[in-house]
Amino acid sequence: MGGVSTARPVIGVLALQGGVAEHLTALERSGAEARPVRRPEELAQVHGLVLPGGESTAMTRLLDGFELFEPLRERLAAGMPAFGSCAGMVLLAGTVLDDRVEQDTPPVRPFGAIDMAVRRNAFGRQVDSFEADLDFAGVTDGPVHAVFIRAPWVDKVGADVRVLASVAPSGHGSEVTAPAGRIVAVQQGPVLATAFHPELVSGDERVHRYFVQTVRAS
């Protein structure tokens, strides 16, 4: 699609796994026309796309099965705005790191839309899920409450990547140390990614509004 010419952009949510309904609701409340996307022809009709959480290796297989992987790769390469949360962040990375990959698990094939290295499940497994309040660049009216579930973090970013939020280790993922805290939200051009799930915080659509504004400006 071409540039966004209306105040109400059409934003899709990749409807293969994760909190699809929650993302759709948050986008609608943020001023977008939100649509689920499962087919290439649906992808072609949106100005931007949300890649929700889930399991990144399974999502890669589902993208292949629904014949969406190549069309999505092409749209991202052409500059389509995108927002990935949790597993969606992993899929948008340039490099994926995983210390716990099992031998029979196929590797994640990331799209390389953001120049970053992301470590899968870095904060731990399901029992290590946690919540934190974060200062989020570009979002006003106080900190963002963030829900982390088997969350990744960003090990490193390229020069063109803006860090939007970080969280101190606080005992999570203590097998890897970093003095400056963990990067958990980034942006490169019109592509945004968070390690946490903003769609799970009812009544706070500020991160989604930030993405909708990004789509409008693209």
Swiss-Prot record:
Active site: 86, 197, 199
Keywords for the protein's UniProt record, in alphabetical order: Glutamine amidotransferase, Hydrolase, Lyase, Pyridoxal phosphate
Catalytic activity: aldehydo-D-ribose 5-phosphate + D-glyceraldehyde 3-phosphate + L-glutamine = pyridoxal 5'-phosphate + L-glutamate + phosphate + 3 H2O + H(+); L-glutamine + H2O = L-glutamate + NH4(+)
Taxonomy of the source species: Bacteria, Bacillati, Actinomycetota, Actinomycetes, Pseudonocardiales
Gene Ontology molecular function, alphabetical: glutaminase activity; pyridoxal 5'-phosphate synthase (glutamine hydrolysing) activity
Any one annotated GO CC term: cytosol
An example Gene Ontology biological process: pyridoxal phosphate biosynthetic process
InterPro entries from the UniProt entry: Class_I_gatase-like, PdxT/SNO, PdxT/SNO_CS
Listed EC numbers: 4.3.3.6, 3.5.1.2
Pathway as given in its UniProt record: Cofactor biosynthesis; pyridoxal 5'-phosphate biosynthesis
Its biological purpose: Catalyzes the hydrolysis of glutamine to glutamate and ammonia as part of the biosynthesis of pyridoxal 5'-phosphate. The resulting ammonia molecule is channeled to the active site of PdxS.
Top-level taxonomic group: Bacteria
HAMAP family linked to this entry: PdxT
SUPFAM superfamilies, alphabetized: Class I glutamine amidotransferase-like
Assembly information from the UniProt record: In the presence of PdxS, forms a dodecamer of heterodimers. Only shows activity in the heterodimer.
Natural source organism: Saccharopolyspora erythraea (strain ATCC 11635 / DSM 40517 / JCM 4748 / NBRC 13426 / NCIMB 8594 / NRRL 2338)
Keyword Phosphoprotein: no
Protein name as catalogued: Pyridoxal 5'-phosphate synthase subunit PdxT
Gene3D superfamilies found in the cross-reference section: 3.40.50.880
Membership in a protein family: Belongs to the glutaminase PdxT/SNO family.
Gene: pdxT
Binding site for L-glutamine: 54-56, 120, 149-150
